[in-house]
From Swiss-Prot:
PANTHER family given in the database record: DNA REPAIR PROTEIN RECO (PTHR33991:SF1)
Function (record text): Involved in DNA repair and RecF pathway recombination.
The protein's name: DNA repair protein RecO
Keywords, ordered alphabetically: DNA damage, DNA recombination, DNA repair
Highest taxon listed in the record's lineage: Bacteria
BP GO annotations: DNA recombination; double-strand break repair
Family: Belongs to the RecO family.
Keyword DNA damage: yes
Keyword DNA damage: yes
Amino acid sequence: MEGWQRAFVLHGRPYSETSLMLDLFTEGEGRMRVLAKGARGRRSNLKGCLQPFTPLLVRWTGRGEVKTLRSAEPVSLALPLTGSMLYSGLYVNELLSRVLEHQTNYSALFFDYLHCLQSLAGSDGSPEYALRQFELAILAHLGYGVDFLHCAGSGQPVSDTMTYRYREEKGFIASLVVDHYSFTGRQLLALANREFPDADTLRAAKRFTRIALKPYLGGKPLKSRELFRQFVIKPPSEPLP
């Protein structure tokens, strides 16, 4: 590849004695797997910068699925994520690693990702709002189109006083059943506008994104959620990502 691309490290693991195998999220090529030769060596100047949440400029070469990293430079310091914000960032990274195809352009999603990290880094409260916004952005970029404003089949506008049940690949239908797949019209209107003014609409957004993302994740649980359970003492008001 000629020229530099903006990128973030999603995940890295040791490879041989001195190298790293990295999953990158790049602006122009989407998710890339690159081998950073010698990056773990004593004299490597890459040790400090090939970390998650550090904005990078990178160059690589190669024609196979795994490229060879040629250069990497930090654009700025790593975004300061700590506590629940750090685990939320790890969740976002794992989500991208699991659902994005290799070497597919997601340039618009790249900026949604950057905005999500900036929101997490600048938040002194709950990460929930930023996470729901980003999950909905991922679904949109994956082509997961859902009409929150009209009843499937009839095409009638959603009423904020009625209850609707979600059916995968069909949408929402009016229903008297209240269960995990049921949403009020008010909650659907909030999802359509991506505005969650209260805890009720925010919880509904989380429930919907979990339902919608499940087919992309398969039956394998997210490791970041388990890490959150193990290492963070979670107050009642701080739900898992």
